[in-house]
Swiss-Prot record:
The lineage of its organism: Eukaryota, Metazoa, Chordata, Craniata, Vertebrata. The modification Phosphoserine is found at residues 177, 179, 183, 693, 928, 944. The keyword RNA-binding applies. It comes from Mus musculus. Transmembrane segments: none annotated. This is Probable RNA-binding protein 19.
Length: 952
């Protein structure tokens, strides 16, 4: 835990001083003091460190220490939702939503406090008591009751008046909804005693003048006339509906006219509680739009229902239907329909000028909903966010995408990847940074490969402390698929192909590190040897044009490799296709010949800050390094397969570790210009226009060959008698210790200790191992000198092993394991079918004299070859020279040649030996018999050792 809570701080504590106190113990990621809503300091605060060690050091130093004259308490924070977290007792803390259970030790109910609380409930009961209402009517003030009024008749007059008013309203109304509404309001007015006791009638109020009484009667007539006018005009009805809904939402008092229409005869400006409760409120779905895709129907019948609207828009499925009513509940002929997408809106607009129940319907797009006031304000501002144009909402169990906020500004992508990769493999991690300061913005998007892993991470990471800050994890929206636009009916094949290539640009199946286009190769070769491009592609000259271009590409590749090595690039990282890729280094390929480094820098610098930009002399392949991973991804996404000059730009993520240490400059640099001059003299085009690419290819590989020949040692097959079997090893002995003991005798080829997994999956030593020497003489010497030697308290038992050493445990991930050269024969795969044996011979004869070239054909023996062949050189040195030159990136007719070392030939003697072993070896024993034999052999050895000890 790297987050601390500091309690009992002094009143005068400021955030700057609070930060300075803890800044000496490490990097602070959060510092906050807590205040009430009124600005009063609550005497505690939170401090966050980047690591747990820094937080622990600060806790040990400040816990129970003094700041000014107050002793503070420093503790580790608890994660959100931790069951061991104490319950909040402060009045400022958020109260729990669970209902409180009544305690048994409650205060007696006859206290004054309880009497005050029970007063309103008792008064409600007295309102229903007829005798109490009669008591109130008798004891009214004489100024409020006429002296000639009959107390016995007052209870009947309100009921008769209510009935008359109801009849009058029913007679005046044309809508069935009004009668239904009045029927709901009638029970609220059937309490004459309540009317008599609480609110006297307007006719008997002495302080009410005659003019005011007449005005109250005139209001009712104006409302009825307004009803008729609003039914005639549809536009005014919509406006009235908007105004009425706004007043209901704001809760503002109604105008006298509307009060008169609602109270049905009550005193103006007074609305009884029973009538307010009986008033029918519209549901929220009729007031506010639920989606931003809304259409408006005009001219709908006044008896329209939601079912009619659904049938009218079939087969669309509306999200919500809002039938507009005026202030009195009458339908106005306007209907607002909320749809789920823009496509459904376009389909709904096609229903314009159709008929619904004999009425002509007009359909419009409603850009701004009439009754929408925006999403309701919530205490959580991240909720209720309107989706963007390129976003769509999807369940977390389907998308697997999380939105992580409140991240530390000192955290990095590696930290987040380490945190979330513990729950499952990640497919994408987007951590935005500020374009000016290059610092994180404090939030990130994490996409898991499997959505169930995202659900697990969402449940466990939300509320956890990460680098001193409490994380807040939410399900994220997902981006709309851009491929839908490319697959539109009107899209051309070219656009579809470009969209598909751009979508698959980061896939590893199309990665070729040193790819060079044939057109760029021809331009570079022609420029280098002062020739024209037509001379390079001249098919009338001697030799194949495809072979000529392939040899030119091989020469350029060798020059590029030499340039990269001189600039500190580790070429070994390019050998593994399955190696992990960098997040900041990009390989830019398929560049036109003569490209300048300034052009590459200008193209890529638009997306962020660049580090190193390497461009060889030919200008065909470049390496671009970004300082921030986010900017590198942005550049890769925008520039992949984009047009650069007149060719598409191919991008590839470089392997990790591509930039190594800068190599030391050799003393033979002064010899390079002379060698280069000799190469140029040998590679001048002849009068017929043929390029002497043979000498150029040999000279370009000379430097690489010399370095490899110095370290080259003929690796032969394992010779019998070179491997030792060591028993009685200590279980704690490691391979390094064992190798150090046996390496004193001679050069060790390999050293392994056999291990097995226990139930927990941990590899444990089995007590024996194998040591393989390069020569049998060294193994015999070690057998004599180290027999009985003590290692980690155990005497070793050494003998010659009769079998090969066990292979080391390898990962399940497939990697390219190059075969060792055992013969002078090379297996060539991916040969184009239009290539013939003469062209293959011409290509490989550049590097040495050939013995045979064979292209196997199908079983019939006719037709084209099968796409692979065997090239056998006379010497192994020539074979290795050709292999090192052509294995990197050589294309023949546009197909890359894949080279492997062929297996050694099976001779007649080998076949005879194998056949004899098959017939002479005894049948295999059962496993139990083999184990018994091993145990007997061990017992015999122990007995013989005991006899030798007795003799001594």
């Amino acid at each position: 835990m790297s987050r601390l809570i500091v309690k009992n701080l002094p009143n005068g504590m400021k955030e700057e001083r609070f930060r300075q106190l803890f800044a000496a113990f490490g990097t602070l990621t959060d510092c906050s003091l807590k205040f009430t809503k009124d600005g009063k300091f609550r005497k505690f605060g939170f401090i966050g460190f980047k690591s747990e060690e820094e937080a622990q050091a600060a806790l040990n130093h400040f816990h129970r220490s003094f700041i000014d004259t107050t002793r503070i308490t420093v503790e580790f924070c608890k994660s959100f939702g931790d069951p061991s977290k104490p319950r909040a007792w402060s009045k400022h803390a958020q109260k729990s939503s669970q209902p409180k259970q009544p305690s048994q030790d409650s205060v007696p109910s006859d206290t004054k406090k309880d009497k005050k609380k029970k007063g309103p409930s008792d008064l409600e009961k007295l309102k229903e008591d007829a005798k109490f209402q009669e008591f109130l009517s008798i004891h009214q003030k004489r100024t409020q009751v006429a002296t000639w009024a009959n107390d016995a008749l007052e209870a009947k007059l309100p009921k008769a008046k209510t009935k008359a008013s109801s009849d009058y309203l029913n007679f005046d109304s044309d809508s069935n909804s009004d009668s239904g509404q009045e029927s709901e309001e009638e029970p609220a007015r059937e309490d004459p005693e309540e009317e008599q006791g609480l609110q006297p009638k307007a006719a008997v109020q002495k302080e009410l003048s005659d003019m005011d009484y007449l005005k109250s009667k005139m209001v009712r007539a104006e409302v009825s006339s307004e009803d008729e006018d609003e039914e005639d005009s549809e536009d005014e009805a919509v406006n009235c509906e908007e105004g009425s809904e706004e007043e209901e939402e704001e809760g503002s008092p109604a105008s006298p006219a509307k009060q008169g229409g609602v109270s049905r005869g009550a005193v103006p400006g007074v609305l009884r509680p029973q009538e307010a409760a009986g008033k029918v409120e519209k549901p929220v779905s009729q007031k506010e739009p639920t989606t931003p895709y809304t259409v408006k129907l005009r001219g709908a019948p006044f008896n329209v229902t939601e079912k009619n609207v659904i049938e009218f828009l079939a087969p669309l499925k509306p999200v919500a239907i809002r039938i507009v009513r005026n202030a009195h509940g009458n339908k106005t002929g306007y209907v607002f329909v909320d749809l789920s997408s823009e496509e459904e809106v376009k389909k709904a607009l096609k229903c314009n000028r159709d008929y619904m129940g004999g009425r002509y319907i007009e359909v419009f797009r409603e850009k701004q909903a009439p009754t929408a006031r925006g999403p309701p304000k919530s205490t959580t501002p991240w909720q209720g966010r309107t989706l963007g144009e390129n976003e769509e909402e999807e369940d977390l169990a389907d998308s697997g995408r999380l939105f992580v906020r409140n991240l530390s500004y000192t955290s990095s992508e590696e930290d987040l990847e380490k945190l979330f990769s513990a729950y499952g493999p990640l497919s994408e991690l987007h951590y935005p940074i500020d374009s000016l300061t290059k610092k994180p913005k404090g939030f990130a998007f994490v996409t898991f490969m499997f959505p169930e892993h995202a659900v697990k991470a969402y449940a466990e990471v939300d509320g956890q402390v990460f680098q001193g800050r409490m994380l807040h994890v939410l399900p994220s929206t997902i981006k709309k698929e851009a491929s839908q636009e490319a697959n539109a009916p009107g899209s051309s094949y070219k656009k579809k192909k470009e969209a598909m290539d751009k979508a698959n640009s980061s896939s590893s199946h199309n990665w070729n590190t040193l790819f060079m286009g044939p057109n760029a190769v021809a331009d570079a070769i022609a420029q280098k040897y002062n020739a024209t491009k037509s001379q390079v592609f001249d098919h009338e000259t001697r030799g194949s044009v495809a072979v000529r271009v392939a040899l030119g590409e091989t020469q350029l590749v060798q020059e590029v490799r030499s340039f990269l090595i001189d600039n500190g690039v580790c070429l070994d990282s390019f050998s593994q296709a399955a190696a992990e890729r960098s997040k900041t280094v990009i390989l830019a390929k398929n560049l036109p010949a003569g490209t300048l480094a300034a052009e590459i820098q200008e193209t890529f610098s638009r997306f962020g800050s660049l580090g190193r930009v390497l461009l060889p002399e030919g200008g065909i392949t470049a390496i671009v390094e970004f300082l921030e991973p986010l900017e590198a991804r942005k550049a890769f996404r925008h520039l992949a397969y984009s047009k650069f000059h007149h060719v598409p730009l191919y991008l590839e993520w470089a392997p990790i570790g591509v930039f190594g240490a800068a190599p030391q400059k050799k003393d033979s640099q002064h010899e390079q210009p002379a060698e280069k001059a000799e190469v140029e003299q040998e590679t001048v085009l002849d009068p017929e226009g043929e390029k002497a690419s043979v000498e150029g290819a040999e000279a370009s590989t000379g430097k690489m060959e010399e370095e490899e020949e110095e370290e080259e040692e003929e690796e032969e097959e394992s010779i019998p008698g070179c491997t030792l079997f060591i028993k009685n090893l200590n279980f704690s002995t490691t391979e390094e210790t064992l190798k150090g003991v046996f390496s004193k005798v001679g050069a060790i080829k390999s050293c392994t200790i056999s291990k097995k997994k226990n139930k927990a999956g941990v590899l444990l030593s089995m007590g024996f191992g194998f040591v393989e020497y390069k020569k049998p003489e060294q193994a015999q010497k070690a057998l004599k000198q180290l027999q009985g030697h003590t290692v980690d308290g155990h005497k070793l038992e050494v003998r010659i092993s009769e079998r090969a050493t066990k292979p080391a445990l390898t990962s399940t991930r497939k990697k390219q394991v190059p075969k060792k050269q055992t013969t002078s024969k090379i297996l060539v795969r991916n040969i184009p079918f239009q290539a013939n044996q003469r062209e293959i011979r011409e290509l490989f004869s550049t590097f040495g004299e050939l013995k045979t070239v064979r292209l196997p054909k199908k079983m019939t023996g006719t037709g084209a070859h099968r796409g692979f062949g065997f090239v056998d050189f006379i010497t192994k040195q020539d074979a290795k020279k050709a292999f090192n030159a052509l294995c990197h990136s050589t294309h023949l007719y546009g197909r890359r040649l894949v080279l492997e070392w062929a297996d050694s030939e099976v001779t007649v003697q080998t076949l005879r030996r194998k056949t004899a072993r098959h017939f002479q070896e005894p049948p295999k024993k059962k496993r139990s018999a083999v184990l018994d034999g091993i145990l007997e052999q061990l017992e015999d050895e122990d007995n013989s050792d005991g006899e030798q000890a007795l003799q001594l």
